[in-house]
Amino acid sequence: MNEQELKQMIEGILTEMSGGKTTDTVAAAPTKSVVETVVTEGSIPDITEVDIKKQLLVPEPADREGYLKMKQMTPARLGLWRAGPRYKTETILRFRADHAVAQDSVFSYVSEDLVKEMNFIPVNTKCQDKDEYLTRPDLGREFDNEMVEVIRANTTKNAKLQIVVGDGLSSAAIEANIKDILPSIKQGLKMYNLDFDNIIFVKHCRVPSMDQIGEITGADVVCLLVGERPGLVTAESMSAYIAYKPTIGMPEARRTVISNIHSGGTPPVEAGAYIAELIHNMLEKKCSGIDLK
């Protein structure tokens, strides 16, 4: 499938998901880089709402337009300034705020209401809490006998595809993207007469947990949608790890990975269409990872 065909497939999925309605895209009006701070009853505006791509703190730059054009190409913290040897207060506060968001995403859990709403099958790895999950990665790859039976009893044996959702290192990534990407994958698979059901949700999930799920279910392809380690740019980045007939202890080279799935990277709807195509190719060629190249 070439780039034009992939684009047409994505447009078709979007049209079908919206009930055939099309929406005109209106360009957002540019906002000023200088935000006036208004204190009301002892509170100030949320500093994280400032678009750092449009914020230039360098006083009297030689080429303001060129600087701002460069900042549009990257979310990196360019165009900062200093007071003596240190960063300005606004820069320090924004750094700490973004770091706090990343920490919150790691230590929080995916909402139980979301798991119920999506009709996921909830299971847990051998980790008992977040501390054990972070310090014992090996336990995040395995299920105890009770969880093995839950997986076996609630999934279709030897299915062509098993979809798995895992919290990973970012619960925010799952909550931000999962409602958009799953319908996109399902719509994309319809083009190849493929479908899936009985989605597993793994709490305290590490990527290799998909290998044991593959052995339990006997699925031809296992696709794991998992929250990735958050950074200072975003805490909502999700990845898809896909493997053909995964087995415990298999080399990482057998996995195909699509990363950086979020609103500021690869949009979840677009990623879903590409994932559907990859799953079809794996089933056709009976391989994944570097063998699929």
UniProtKB/Swiss-Prot annotation:
Coiled coil: none annotated. Adenosylcob(III)alamin binds at V207, E228. It comes from the Bacteria. Disulfide bonds: none annotated. Its EC number is 4.3.1.7. One of its GO terms (cellular component) is ethanolamine degradation polyhedral organelle. Pathway: Amine and polyamine degradation; ethanolamine degradation. Its cofactor is adenosylcob(III)alamin. GO terms for biological process: amino acid metabolic process; ethanolamine catabolic process. It holds the Pfam family EutC. It catalyses: ethanolamine = acetaldehyde + NH4(+). Keywords: Bacterial microcompartment, Cobalamin, Cobalt, Lyase. It is found in: Bacterial microcompartment. InterPro entries: EutC, EutC_C, EutC_N. Binds between the large and small subunits. It is an enzyme of class 4 (lyase). One of its GO terms (molecular function) is ethanolamine ammonia-lyase activity. Its main location: other. The basic unit is a heterodimer which dimerizes to form tetramers. The heterotetramers trimerize; 6 large subunits form a core ring with 6 small subunits projecting outwards. Belongs to the EutC family. Catalyzes the deamination of various vicinal amino-alcohols to oxo compounds. Allows this organism to utilize ethanolamine as the sole source of nitrogen and carbon in the presence of external vitamin B12. This is Ethanolamine ammonia-lyase small subunit. The gene is eutC.
